[in-house]
Amino acid sequence: MVVPADVNLEDSILISKDFNIDTSVFNEKLLDAKNFSNVKASILINNISKDEYAPIQEKLWKHSGFFVQKKSKRTYNALTAANLLGYISEVNKSEVEKNSYYEIGEMIGRQGLEKTYEDKLRGVKGVKFFQKDKFNRIIGSYKNGDYDTLPIPSKDLTLTIDLDLQQYGDSLMQNKRGSIVAIEPKTGDILALINSPSYDLSSLIDKNRSINYKKLENDSIGKPLFERGLQGQYAPGSTFKIINALIGLQENVINEETMHRCEGGHFYSKNAFMRCHTKETTFSNLNNAIYTSCNTYFAKTYKEIIENYESSSAGLDKWNDYVRSFGFGNYLGYDHPTGQPGFIPSSQYYNNWYNNSWRAVTTISNSIGQGEILATPIQLANFAATIANRGWYITPHFVKEIENDSINDNYKRKNVSLIDSKHFEPIINGMIDVIDIGTATNSKIRDIKIAGKTGTAENFIRVNGKRKQLTDHSIFIGFAPADDPKIAVCVFIENGYWGSRWAAPISSLIIEKYLKKEVNRKWLENYILEGNLNKEYLKPYLTCNFSICLLYTSDAA
């Protein structure tokens, strides 16, 4: 620490040498400290190690205006949840100018829960007043300490995260990119938020934190600082068919027994064909359409929803209202500063795009979760929790308790969707069959009934201005036990082929680990642990042409 008024500037070269700091750096930091306050102490050197402390302490007596002050330092007991917890760093000049609480060199929550709960985690500084003589020497306390205040310790936060589940999820996501979000449906407690790839938080608390941060920031391939579970905006694919089924039931354009004919796909206009999972002619009711993921069924249902109103604009806006009531298209309001709202198109969007000339079939990709629709993994996990609750959700949150304080009332209040509760049971029955006889039979768990839905999202990049297809993303949403849900999950694996290949098995392992505390299906666990998708992630950066996985599966996009 340095008090600028007490420093002999003629000794700056010797001071720099004794404290092992570059003279120009010393002069710059001393000027910053002086600009902040000439008589108040500011930090000169931060994060002094034990090895550095001894030689500095030995030389302090030679230089007035300097002293060593101990301070708390973050330690991390587990190598997990880096983006969730966030990191701290020194306040900048602008922050000091805006908030008189902070002084140059002090730390502030920069990201994650560290930022959201900064005022709880920092505590309150104490103040002690001293009297000085004309030689600027301390001669005692001021007014016998009547104006002194004691520091108030920071408050402990109890997180909703299940550490065992979080770390298990980390292991499953090795050599894969994407996220896992797990929520307790009845409470909105977020049980796990896994981001892959991630990083070691301890690398951002030592002297090299600036260098280490730059390395993370410059990793344009892995993007470890990008919190995919909260920031990743993706097409939800076939998982979105569930919401269109619910809206169809609510709007009375379908019921459980409504049959639709599928001839390997659907001609939604004269020359426009939406392919389905089979080339054979089939007839599906609602249950069958869910567990086989029939594109035709949901395309026809969506078209009838929009055309159930006097105009396409009115129908689309009503559809938009239904979708948003599940938390899509907004930030959800969780207690983390990072996030994206996703995107749910409105009639105004299409009016602007198509100059007021469009119909239901123009927007038919909405029926299968493609096109303009974007959702984040936490929104999809919250959607699964809402289905599990038969139509309502508690705003997801990461903090369960605050020491001697209360959490926000928003994390206790029910948010009710616009779908009547009676419509959820047939949907859930179809989602159970997804696991039992449908697109995710490889993810069954003995003695645990899972309700879920696989999804495959199209994946493209721009190469020299041209759109080039990459291997599709793998998605799964679900909850268990189906009759009394304790956990709702969304797993999103970038470039993971189809939903049943990676996302569904990982989800089932997460569910098994949480409900049974151990995993018995070692064959499946080993398959996931050994799975490596790094070759897929390198393809866009190859100078040669590359191929993608286009295997035709029962899981339609």
Task: Please provide the spans of the model-predicted regions.
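Juxtamembrane extramembrane loops of integral membrane proteins
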Residues: M1-N20
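Carboxylate/His-rich catalytic cores and anion/metal-binding grooves
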Residues: Q111-Q131, R177-S202
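Conserved small/polar residues in nucleotide/adenosyl-binding loops
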Residues: Y552-A557
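Beta-lactam-recognizing serine transpeptidase/beta-lactamase-like catalytic domain environment
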Residues: D133-I138, Y142-D148, K186-T239, I243-I493, ...
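Small/polar-residue-rich segments within soluble enzyme cores
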Residues: L14-F19, L31-S154, V491
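Conserved, well-ordered alpha-helix/loop/beta-strand core segments that scaffold catalytic motifs
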Residues: G140-S179
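Short, gly/Ser/Thr-rich active-site loops of penicillin-recognizing serine hydrolases
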Residues: I407-N415, I506-I548
